[in-house]
């Protein structure tokens, strides 16, 4: 089994209801995402998952020099950012892509699928 990152992309800066048009739409997406999370757990794919706060609250840490440098804000200035993610364990890419499509429908966002490069 391989671990995959399913990264949900959305606007870097969130509006009042995230990337949803209304509170109702946001609540529907959250409920659908919770049901999808339950499915991942029940079927044994779930490793970890979560939503992220706005990219403007990020801090970039560069510890390559003698003294770490910490910079407020996202690493890259961009219109989109990762708003949440799942780490799943799946037998192959085909299954990971199928699950990503289900997750995309549930959260109403684009999902990028990337296999992990081995396990640490």
Give residue ranges: language-model regions:
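Conserved, structured core segments of small domains
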Residues: 1-120
């Amino acid at each position: 089994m391989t671990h995959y990152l399913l990264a949900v992309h959305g606007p870097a800066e969130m509006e009042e209801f995230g990337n949803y048009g209304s509170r109702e739409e946001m609540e529907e997406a959250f409920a659908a995402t919770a049901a999808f999370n339950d499915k991942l757990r029940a079927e044994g794919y779930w490793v970890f998952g979560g939503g992220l706060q706005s990219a403007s609250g990020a801090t970039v840490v560069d510890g390559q020099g003698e003294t770490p440098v910490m910079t407020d804000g996202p690493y890259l200035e961009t219109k989109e950012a990762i708003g949440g993610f799942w780490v799943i364990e799946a037998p192959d890419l085909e299954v990971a892509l199928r699950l990503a499509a289900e997750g995309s429908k549930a959260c109403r966002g684009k999902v990028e699928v990337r296999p992990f490069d081995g396990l640490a």
